[in-house]
Swiss-Prot record:
Major localization class: host cell
Gene Ontology annotations of biological process type: DNA replication
Motif (RCR-3): 103-106
UniProt-recorded name of the protein: Replication-associated protein
Binding site for ATP: G222, D223, S224, R225, R226, G227, K228, T229
GO cellular component: a single term: host cell nucleus
Tree of life domain: Viruses
Length: 361
């Protein structure tokens, strides 16, 4: 037991206030880091503020690895590096480290060292409520910043509801997929077969209100370097699904006019969403790996691009006996086109770009 009137504070978190202190926050941090204390320091945060009269003062949060019993009220004194002036702080044990941290960083002129230590009292007490923390997380602007706030101020939810939090914040802070910018205009494609052009005009040549409820898709087969991919992608805003299907909201948008399905094996598509995509079906779900089901708005056609040959050709795949019923369905929902020549004039910009962009077609 300390003697009556003696100084003694035992705490893991210390809140220091230097009421008149001209030392920079960087110098203060250096001196506090170099204090010789039997308990390891884990985190230090310092804020420099100005009084109404312009005089500076410092607020400091120091966190230790375990409880530290401070019996020397001069321990945290700071010394001016240019003269012998000492700056003595008011010393308190901080019951809620999060509340103190929030107070220290409120004006923004701060510096910190180490990793902030979360404790149960921070989540329960002080002025911080669940609603306050949720509002702060929502206003943080990014998923990463929101998760940091929740981890610090609602650690129980962070630990036991992490998966749900992560999924929810993905949706809340979701950014629309970047719009693909075509490297050259649609007019570069001067050798488009009539049937392909009729299909494009029948859909893109109409307003959204005049388009059918479930528009017809198109399957285009042809050798590599014919211009299939570039033509398909220059028609308008679209989702580009290459090699596999990915409906993650970060890459797939419900606000486009069509899908481009490029180099996706027919065997794979049959196991996934053949009818939903080629049939322009509306309001269906797809399961994302490690995530919750994604709701697909649908109602848009697909342009399927493939090479000839076993494993690639959709026509050859559908001609197999075991796919007879799927073939009958597909013939009612898609147009088949086989191209034998480039869709552009040789030597045009499209020809050059195709060599870089379309290695497999």
């Amino acid at each position: 037991m300390p003697r009556k009137g003696s100084f003694s504070i035992k705490a893991k978190n210390y809140f220091l206030t230097y009421p008149q202190c001209s030392i920079s926050k960087e110098e203060a941090l250096s001196q506090l880091q170099n204090l010789t204390i039997p308990v390891n320091k884990k985190f230090i945060k310092i804020c420099r503020e100005l009084h109404e009269n312009g005089e500076p003062h410092l607020h400091v949060l120091i966190q230790f690895e375990g409880k530290y019993n401070c019996t020397n009220n001069r321990l945290f004194d700071l010394v001016s590096p240019t003269r012998s002036t000492h700056f003595h702080p008011n010393i308190q044990g901080a019951k809620s480290s999060s509340d103190v941290k929030s107070y220290v960083e409120k004006d923004g002129d701060t510096i910190e060292w180490g990793l902030f230590q979360i404790d149960g009292r921070s989540a329960r007490g002080g002025q911080q409520t669940v609603n306050d923390a949720a509002a702060e997380a929502l206003n943080s602007g990014t998923k990463e910043a929101a998760m940091k706030i929740i981890k610090e101020k609602l650690p129980e939810k962070f630990l036991f509801q992490y998966h749900n939090l992560s999924c929810n914040l993905d949706r809340i802070f979701m950014k629309a997929p970047e719009t693909w910018a075509p490297p050259f205009p649609l007019s570069s494609f001067t050798n488009v077969p009539d049937e392909m052009q009729e299909w494009a005009d029948g859909y893109f040549g109409k307003s959204s209100a005049a388009r059918p409820e479930r528009p017809i898709s198109i399957i285009i087969e042809g050798d590599s370097r014919r211009g299939k991919t570039m033509w398909a992608r220059v028609l308008g805003p679209h989702n580009y699904l290459s090699g596999h299907l990915d409906f993650n909201p970060r890459v797939y948008s419900n606000e486009v006019e069509y899908n481009v399905i490029d180099d996706v094996a027919p065997q794979y598509l049959k196991l996934k969403h053949w009818k939903e995509l080629l049939g322009a079906q509306r309001d269906w779900q797809s399961n994302c790996k490690y995530g919750k089901p994604v709701q697909i708005k649908g109602g848009i056609p697909s342009i399927v691009l493939c090479n000839p040959g076993e494993g690639s050709s959709y026509k050859a795949f559908l001609d197999k006996d075991e796919n007879a019923s799927l073939k009958n369905w597909t013939l009612k929902n898609a147009v088949f086109i086989t191209i034998t020549a480039p869709l552009y004039q040789e030597g045009t910009q499209a020809s050059k770009e195709e060599g870089n962009q379309e290695e497999t077609h």
